[in-house]
Amino acid sequence: MQMLIPQRLLLILNPILMMKRKKRKKRKKRRERETMMKIPRILKKLRRKRRTRRKRRKRRKRRRRKRRKRRRKRSPRKRRKRRNKDAFYILIISDPSRSLLFGFRKFSIIIQCLTYFSFHILFHNL
């Protein structure tokens, strides 16, 4: 049974749904191996790559250290607030005869409508 979703509900839902959808990482395509003749050149390239990799690793370590320092400074109360915000949202709808079910990749939302403008949305992380 299809029911029109009130505009206000959509305004509340859209940003949340956008936040919940995770971005996928792009995978790099592997190049096919070169022929025997190019081996010395490949070796040289590898050496260069190794050097850059080392630099990158160092940079990453430094960044991680800085991040840890920053994290430590946050007060426990603030940390608790953040954790609660990340967990899930319960927005305050209730007539089970007019309940909607949205299905998404990561979670589903059940919306039970009592009146046209009051809604009660439950998130289930699947």
From Swiss-Prot:
Residues 21-31, 41-83 have a biased composition (Basic residues). It comes from the Eukaryota. Residues 21-83 are annotated as: Disordered. Partially overlaps NOP58. This is Putative uncharacterized protein YOR309C.
